[in-house]
Amino acid sequence: MLKSNNIIPSRICEIGCGAGEILNCLANEYGDDVVFSGYDISPQAFEICRKKEKQNLHFFLKDLLDEEAISFDVVMAIDVFEHVEDYFGFLRKLKKKGTYKIFHIPLDLSVLTVLRSTPILKGRQSFGHIHYFTKETALATLKDTGYEVVDYFYTRAFLKLPRYRGWKINLMKLSRSLCFSLHHDLAVRILGRFSLLVLAT
């Protein structure tokens, strides 16, 4: 997404970096021309990610939002603000931390999930999602908190599911792929299990 929008960063940060694998992959891809910083408030996550530190990759057991006078070219929040109780306040504070922001937002609301309700409850219990979005409400949330959306596209997590998980799951996986190839928005709105990657300023 950065390359397609001709953005050449020198400092990239991830808030809520977890095990740090996203930053680790990016650090390997970009090399020493870019410095990467990961922030997380979980001691358990920090113990995992600190082992991946290298010359251009550093991790901090801190809340980025509490850090004064620090900013980056790009700040990433990958599957983060759906976990935050005051996500409007979180987004407003985060805006000051970087020139560009990249968000990855699970789109938990679809016709299928609303009709069944179980997937939403499972996401709440298993993943800690306490806010649920469609594409429209996700983009509106960013605009309401002062962001300007530069670019976005869907990502399809269901494609990573292994084939041996059962015929029902494989059938739904095929249905989502076929519907998505015909009409992106309709497939996302009806069948779900998509996320949104957003570039904003």
Place the predicted regions along the sequence by residue.
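Conserved alpha-helix/loop element of class I SAM-dependent methyltransferases that forms part
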Residues: 1-8
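Class I SAM-dependent methyltransferase "Motif I" SAM/SAH-binding loop
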Residues: 16-18
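Class I SAM-dependent methyltransferase SAM/SAH-binding core
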Residues: 21, 25-57, 61-63
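S-adenosyl-L-methionine-dependent methyltransferase catalytic module, highlighting the catalytic core
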Residues: 21, 44-48, 52, 85-199
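Short conserved loop adjoining the S-adenosyl-L-methionine
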Residues: 66-70
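A conserved beta-strand element that flanks and buttresses the S-adenosyl-L-methionine
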Residues: 76
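Hydrophobic adenine-recognition pocket in adenosine-nucleotide-binding enzymes
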Residues: 80
